Each structure stands twice: as C-alpha cells, then as structure tokens.
Amino acid sequence: MQLENLNVEQQEVLITPEQLKARLPVSEDVREAVNGYRETVRNIVDRKDPRLLVVVGPCSIHDVEAAKEYAQRLKRLSDDIADHVFVVMRAYFEKPRSTVGWKGLINDPHLDDSFKVAEGLHIGRQLLLELSQMGLPLATEALDPITPQYMQDLISWSAIGARTTESQTHREMASGLSCPVGFKNGTDGSLGVAINALESVASPHRFLGISPTGQVSVIQTKGNAHGHVVLRGGSSGPNYSPEHIQACEAALEKLSLTQSIMVDCSHANSNKDHRQQRNVVNSVSQQIAAGNRSITGLMIESHLHEGNQSISNPDGLSYGVSITDACINWDETDSLLRQLAEQLASRPS
C-alpha cells in the first residue's frame, strides 16, 4: 500500500544551479558591477549615501523583448539622475498569488499553464545577464527558497513580500542572501511582522536547502545585516503619511534598528490605482524636503505602457503592458523620476 506522494502526479529533475551558471556564466565585468551596485544599496540603506534608492519597473516580466526595451530607456534615465537617485530595475520572475493565477516567468514562461520551469530558469537568467550587461542594477522578489541559487548572483536588492514576511522559511532564506533585503508590512497593514523579520534576518540560521550541485543540504547562514522595512499599505489603508513614517521610526528605534524605510508607491498605498503612485511620490519627496532622513527608498510599478491586461488570450497580448498589477507608462515614469531628482537636489544638506 502506497503511503506517500498520493497527491503527486509527476516529478521532473531540473538542471542544477551550478550547471545553469556554467551555461550562462557571469563575466568579470558584470561580477564587479554587481558587487559595486550592492555596496551602493547597502550604503543607502545604512544611511551612509544620501541618494534615494528607487526600485522601479514592471510588476512582473513576461515578455523579454519588452523588458529589454524598458531597460534601455531606464538606463538612460538613471544616468541622467544618478547624482540624487540610485535606480534599480525590477526583474520580478515569481509572483505570489492570493488564490490561483499566473505564477511568473520562471514557473510558466509560455503563459499557457505548461509550467516549463527548466525553460523559465534559462530565460530568466539569460535576461538578467543581458540587463546586467546594459549597466543596470536589478531587484527581484525572493519567493521560492530554491530559486536564489539560480539567480541571486545577478541581484542587487531583494524583496520579501507582504504574504511571506511572516514566514520562517523566507526569513531564514533572506538571512543568507548576498544583497540587502526589504521586508514588506503585512497585507493587513501591520508593521510588527516586518519589524520582527528584521531581527530574524540579522541572525544566523540553519535550514534545509539545496547546494549549487542540487543536493539537499543544511544551509548555515551568517545573517543579513541589511534588512529594512518596506511600507506598502494594507487593508486599513495607505501608510506613507508623516504620521505613519514617524510610527515606523519609533518602532525601529525601540529595538535599536536602523531607521531606514522604503515606501512602496503601489499596492495599498495607491489604493490599487496605478495613477495614484504619483501622489505617493510627491508626499514622500515633500517629507524628505522637510528634513526626513529615514526614508531611504521608493518602489514604483512602471512599464512601457499604462495599465494591465488579462492573459486569457496569450497570443493576443498588447506589447509592453503588464499582465499582473497595473503600471504607470514610460513617459509618466520619466517625468516622475526627473521631478523627484530635482526636488532631492534642493533638499537641505
């Protein structure tokens, strides 16, 4: 009588992280660049670099060509505003779902429920390499605990999402990531889960994972000293007002944690209306102009074209439009970030 795998239909052996990296290796130039990007992000998060960290880009990437076109535009913009804003592009390949839905490029690269994960890993890593060669720092959400072994060497900032910030598995994983990590507050707006995560991620952990050769292993981490809070609003409403920022500062100070806060301009902070992201950016820039120093970053969901679309007909998708959360378009992004840089240039030193 069978006692295990009763609900498992199929198992597929994947390429190991070591094998994928051998097929798609990192050049020495990219290696040095990523190391430099991470150091810059660490310095901003630690409030040693006065620039604002802005993580911007598509909610998720489903079209490689559109992502590369977006990246080319973003690179030109980032060079223009680099004195005041350090731009990191969103390269999100995994999407957490409240119920069901498309889980991202790695899980389902063809958008047809075929779940060609081996292809998704290859496509994702190839794109990260190409974007890195353009000279862009990259950000992603660390969702599946195995995926970082395939991708994290090309990532300069990672997020732990609102649905997973409270997860022990994700806190342990984040303690071993090689880049700074932002923890979002809970979907209900609660700050405590993110604050607790900062304490956890800074500590060493031991947990089950996989090695570069794909073997199940006990992973022992040193702890990640560069965790920080990402305020994204919640069911109770937005949480980017001066009062919310001050409450977050007080909670961090109480536990002797660095007062370093990123504000997510989308999700509940925009009331799930992408057009309201500008209002969030304006509020935050006003707070910084008034002397706030704890706000070290912003997150903006942006694409080539505005809004979003359903994937019910994958062959009929509009180019450069999100298939997950709605985004602002490129012209709005360019205008918003240039305006932000101008405002930062005039802030008190």
Predicted regions and their residues:
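N- or domain-start disorder-to-order transition segments that initiate the globular core
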Residues: 6-46
